[in-house]
Amino acid sequence: MPDTHVVTNQVPPLENYNPASSPVLTEALIREGGQWGLDEVTELGALSGSRQAQRWGELADRNQPILRTHDRFGHRVDEVEYDPAYHELMKVAVGHGLHAAPWADERPGSHVVRAAKTSVWTPEPGHIC
């Protein structure tokens, strides 16, 4: 479909950026003993700002979870059906230790590294609650 006009009053999509590139975040990680996690935080930040992760966030927000209380035979099942994008977001979050890494890692600064990862993993914040 050809463009009908030039749109000049809208910002471009915010994608392919790294929220972990903040010098303030880097300084805080180093100061609080989490320098060992800089590479992990940077890697997660790059994924967070990617077009793919932004799309997952958009789909997860657009397609709300569906509560299924009973199956087709009337048996109680109480399950929640999530969009596959929500599962992708969760897979990344759990894979990077956002759920419990500091309690399994005794290195100094482990809570700071987790906090930094949580702050940069921003495509859709509801799945971290």
Predicted regions and their residues:
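Active-site-adjacent bridging/hinge elements
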Residues: 105-116
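Hydrophobic, small-residue-rich alpha-helical packing segments that form membrane-like cores
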Residues: 117-129
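Extended, charge-enriched "interface" segments that sit outside catalytic cores
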Residues: 1-107
